[in-house]
């Protein structure tokens, strides 16, 4: 029984060994043959002003986190809005007013953040 199972899976084992060996050879060749010259474009700072090879634990402005949180909130708003828009023909008046209140709360929150200066980048 064991020899029968071994003979059935021998081709799979050979395939895995061959693919592992081939991937190691390809990775090794790309490492040996690739040019290691860093060009000036790769070393230039990102659009946000950070250098690509600085310490990752450096000082980081808190406003980036605020913008990220605001993006997530409004991205989730869109994620909730898509299924509602797809099923708009089947939505009752209760569903319409529920979405209207949802959008109104988010709009009031956005105006509040704007008035408090959360979106100002001084």
From Swiss-Prot:
Topology term for the membrane: Multi-pass membrane protein
InterPro entries: NAD(P)H_OxRDtase_bac/plastid (IPR023043), NADH_UbQ/plastoQ_OxRdtase_su3 (IPR000440), NDAH_ubi_oxred_su3_sf (IPR038430)
Compartments where located: Mitochondrion membrane
Predominant place of localization: mitochondrion
Cysteine disulfide partners in this protein: none
Membrane-crossing segments per the record: 12-32, 66-86, 91-111
Principal EC category: translocase
A single GO molecular function term of this UniProt record: NADH dehydrogenase (ubiquinone) activity
Keywords from the UniProt entry: Electron transport, Membrane, Mitochondrion, NAD, Respiratory chain, Translocase, Transmembrane, Transmembrane helix, Transport, Ubiquinone
The enzyme's E.C. designation: 7.1.1.2
Keyword Translocase set for record: yes
Pfam families named among the record's database cross-references: Oxidored_q4
Example of a GO cellular component annotation carried by this entry: NADH dehydrogenase complex
Catalyzed chemical reaction(s): a ubiquinone + NADH + 5 H(+)(in) = a ubiquinol + NAD(+) + 4 H(+)(out)
Annotated family: Belongs to the complex I subunit 3 family.
Role this protein plays: Core subunit of the mitochondrial membrane respiratory chain NADH dehydrogenase (Complex I) that is believed to belong to the minimal assembly required for catalysis. Complex I functions in the transfer of electrons from NADH to the respiratory chain. The immediate electron acceptor for the enzyme is believed to be ubiquinone.
Annotated protein name in UniProt: NADH-ubiquinone oxidoreductase chain 3
Organism: Reclinomonas americana
């Amino acid at each position: 029984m064991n020899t029968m199972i071994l003979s059935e899976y021998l081709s799979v084992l050979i395939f895995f060994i061959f693919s592992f060996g081939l991937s190691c050879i390809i990775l090794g060749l790309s490492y040996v043959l690739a040019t290691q010259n860093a060009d000036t474009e790769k070393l230039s700072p990102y659009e946000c002003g950070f250098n690509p090879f600085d310490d990752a634990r450096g000082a980081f402005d808190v406003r980036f986190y605020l913008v990220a949180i605001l993006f997530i909130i409004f991205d989730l708003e869109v994620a909730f809005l898509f299924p509602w828009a797809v099923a708009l023909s089947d939505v009752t008046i209760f569903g319409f007013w529920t979405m209207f209140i949802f959008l109104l709360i988010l709009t009031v929150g956005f105006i509040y953040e704007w008035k408090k200066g959360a979106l100002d980048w001084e």
